[in-house]
Amino acid sequence: VRVRDITLPPERTLQITNWFSMGNIAAYHGVTMWSESFWKVLDVYARFMADYRQNAARTMLFDLITASEDPQGRLTFDFSRFDRFVEMLEKAGLIGTIEGSHLAYRTDWKTHVLKGHRPVTTLPDGSQKKWVYVEVDSPEQREFLAQFLPALVKHLQEKGWRDRYVQHLSDEPVAANAAAYNALAAMVREFAPGVKTIDATMCREVAGSVDIWVPQPSEIDRNREFFDSRRKLGEQVWIYTCLNPKGRYMNRFIDYHLLSPRLIHWMNFKYGFEGYLHWGLNFQLGDAFKNVERGYPNPNNLPAGDSHIVYPGRYGPIPSIRFDAMRDGIEDYELLRLLAHSRGAGARRICDSVVRSMTDYTLDPSEFRKARARLLDALEKAH
């Protein structure tokens, strides 16, 4: 065994988020949501994700924040559960970046309408308000956001979290609902000025509404000029994978080569993509060990492993070997970046020998190990 005289930098520069289901955590471990037992189990998951170098977390605003409405219709917000969640993840080393969950949703892929989320709201008589979910550009939703967003930003500022917060608007907008998305973005700009927006999208029609683009690599490949132009304007470009892309593109499905989830993060380095997002840490249905092809959207199944990359164990999550490979790739990214500080051309040559393009990369373990050995040799010489 040869031990290298190299230390990973303490700063984690690559933004990594695997969205996780708190409901599944509670269900699989037999605890009630928001009970003390739940918080203990969630802490185990948070530390686990941090160990695997995740440093951003989707924060479910309308599960964590509740509201009270006075007789005049004015809302006050209770952030105590939100604070406990963020503080726990912060202490665990997971946050990092706070991803505010989506403010709106769509009922159909190509609908023109986006509808706004609302929190659980208590009325003066102690009953819960029965919200009617309305379109994002309606006067009712505007009135809600005019109260909610300033209160949220004020609270983030008071807690010292303002600069680490980014806001999702609606997941994967397409041309059909771009107008509604842009209207929602305009309200976020108005009521939460300076808050960066982020979403998984490849839709040109929402340009100007997105600060952090998160497209699939295949879409960047087909629209390189567009995404380069957005970066020149100061916007960030991350990448995400889900049930797509397939074919020659890297992904982290069970039946893909184990180098594939690792090399995703060599691709991060090669093209300067600042982050990586995946929707499915633990969104399995039924037996996580047997049901690996989640039936969604019906009647089609998701590719094997898309819905979850960890498994529920008796005392906490069990990593898959794909998750181990992903963590190794994130560490490789930091090593490449470390070498690039002193020998940029050398780091790029090593990376290019492994990932030649988004669809041309080595799956030969021997070739990969030799390239990584060259990386470690160069780092030892440089430091």
Can you say where each PLM-predicted feature lies in the sequence?
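Short, hydrophobic/amphipathic alpha-helical patches that form generic packing surfaces
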Residues: 48-51, 81, 263-271, 331-339
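Catalytic domains of carbohydrate-active enzymes that cleave complex glycans
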Residues: 120, 126-181, 185-202, 273, ...
